[in-house]
Amino acid sequence: MSRIGKKTIVIPAGVTVTLNGSTATVKGPKGELVKEFNPEITIKIEGNEINVSRPTDNKNHRALHGTTRAILNNMVVGVSEGYEKKLELIGVGYRAQKQGDKLVLNVGYSHPVEFVAPKGVDIEVPANTQVIVKGYNKEHVGELAANIRAVRPPEPYKGKGIRYEGEHVRRKEGKTGK
C-alpha cells in the first residue's frame, strides 16, 4: 500500500504557500492556484516544508490523506515548473494549426474542430502534426489534452488518430478474406 500522504512536500525557492483555514493558496513564478481541502485533514507549513496529517486511520481519512498531499504537491510543482502534454496527429491529411488563441484541428471530419484554451493554459503547434498543451494547473492541462485526444482517438487497425506522445496503441489484425 502506498504511503504517499506521509511524505513531506518541499517548497522550492520563489514559491509561497499560505493557509487560510482549509484553503491553500500557492503562488509562484508561473501563476497562482487556490484550492479548498477537506477540513478534517490537517495541513501544516514548517519552514520550507508542508506536512499533511489525518485525524484517524479509518478508510475515508486514509484516502483523503494521500489525495490531499498529491494535489498540494501538484500545485507546488505547477507554479514552479509547470506541466505540459504533447499530442501527435497521425493520419493522412490530419493537421493542427493555431489561429489567434484558438487551436483548429483538421482530422478527417467535414468541418474543422476548434478549441479555445482556458485561462492559464497555452497551446503550441510546433509542427502541423504536433500539439503541446502547457500550463501551471495539472488538472486543466490534462483535461484539455484529453478533450483534444477525444476528437479522434487512435483506432486499433491503422493507428490513425490523435495520441499522446509515446502512447502505445494496441493494434488488431484486420479480417482475412476467404
Curated annotation (Swiss-Prot):
Pfam families: Ribosomal_L6
Role this protein plays: This protein binds to the 23S rRNA, and is important in its secondary structure. It is located near the subunit interface in the base of the L7/L12 stalk, and near the tRNA binding site of the peptidyltransferase center.
PANTHER family the record matches: 60S/50S RIBOSOMAL PROTEIN L6/L9, LARGE RIBOSOMAL SUBUNIT PROTEIN UL6M
InterPro entries according to UniProt: Ribosomal_uL6-like, Ribosomal_uL6-like_a/b-dom_sf, Ribosomal_uL6_a/b-dom, Ribosomal_uL6_bac-type, Ribosomal_uL6_CS
Protein name (Swiss-Prot/TrEMBL): Large ribosomal subunit protein uL6
Family the entry assigns: Belongs to the universal ribosomal protein uL6 family.
Oligomer status and interactors: Part of the 50S ribosomal subunit.
Alphabetical keyword list: Ribonucleoprotein, Ribosomal protein, RNA-binding, rRNA-binding
One of the protein's GO biological processes: cytoplasmic translation
Gene Ontology molecular-function annotations: rRNA binding; structural constituent of ribosome
GO CC annotation terms, alphabetical: cytosolic large ribosomal subunit
